């Protein structure tokens, strides 16, 4: 039998949160590339013949590990924070994360002088927590897992006066990370 997971509670709209199902277009991704240009260089795309031979197909690797936080998510964090209205930048941001998303928001917040609060669950990767903290984020331990940390953020963001940054439903975040696909198409257009 097939089991279908149901969300624990319905999704509600939070302060400053974009409407669900926002569509991100190629125009949005091109705008994100312009926004990111002063802060990030394109990453290399390499073909590894031995890896291709081992897998029996042509394989190309996009080296997002060369980004400042070692992950592609920094693209989304920078584009999102760069495009926040001034009042939201002054207020600061809050999000939940177990790692790369939090690092992305912490890095971008430091870049633009914005306060960042990151809720992490108990037991989250200590190296990721240390990185977020070193990037200037305020770390708050909440819950046993990501969902509990996220639920805490959703409940507290408005009362704290912070702009909630959803880890996925953010058009600027999505457009920012989409820039790596543009680079792939330009670097290996076939």
Predicted regions and their residues:
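Short, low-complexity intrinsically disordered segments enriched in A/P/G/S/L with frequent Arg
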Residues: 9-13
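PLP-dependent amino-acid enzyme catalytic core
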Residues: 16-190
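Short amphipathic, helix-prone segments within low-complexity/disordered or flexible regions
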Residues: 2-5
